[in-house]
């Protein structure tokens, strides 16, 4: 396969290298990743400045491209400009830190997989608990296993997978679960501080004690030491509500 690897932690991130080491054994792997960390930039792209691409001579070998833009920019460039033929698969990760529940909406890692999905390229976003995780290599090996197994199942159009892993050795992982996205609000708090001039400034801070999730959701599974796999659609239409709205007559 022709595989593009990307992330939002930047081209020098350990999680990206762990994936490269595993997948480059049997596939052509091209790394197209942000030149610096671009965490939590969501699905932003660069419209008002040119994108610079610097090909790196990486110690691991292979093709590595550092891009001045966002994770979504990296995937767009990889599909439209840098790879010929188009990639068969895009893998985004391994992210340092989970992208479950509401954090999917902020994540550059998830957005990169979504961007590939928009172009009809199969894709998967992979994230692991921990800052930084201790088991990137095992996470990369597990990702390879998932890709091989999931290749047996044809994914529906406009769908990609969001995978979250506990930061545990493989023998301590309790299982793998296909589950829904948790809908709890993000576990954030805002810290207000004062600078040396007495002016207020604010930091977002993550509250890891914010709920265990409910039911068969990604957050709940991860609390139990289980790998969560959530199918995500690029079609944001709520079809149930759409059918109800069609019952209304709105005249201008």
Curated annotation (Swiss-Prot):
Top-level taxon: Bacteria
Reactions the enzyme catalyzes: a ribonucleoside 5'-phosphate + H2O = a ribonucleoside + phosphate
Cofactor note: Binds 1 divalent metal cation per subunit.
Pfam families: SurE
Ligand binding (a divalent metal cation): 8-9, 39, 95
EC number: 3.1.3.5
Gene Ontology molecular function: 5'-nucleotidase activity; metal ion binding; nucleotide binding
InterPro entries: SurE, SurE-like_Pase/nucleotidase, SurE-like_sf
Cellular component annotations (GO), alphabetically ordered: cytoplasm
Entry's transmembrane regions: none
Family (UniProt): Belongs to the SurE nucleotidase family.
Function: Nucleotidase that shows phosphatase activity on nucleoside 5'-monophosphates.
UniProt name for this protein: 5'-nucleotidase SurE
Name of the gene this protein is made from: surE
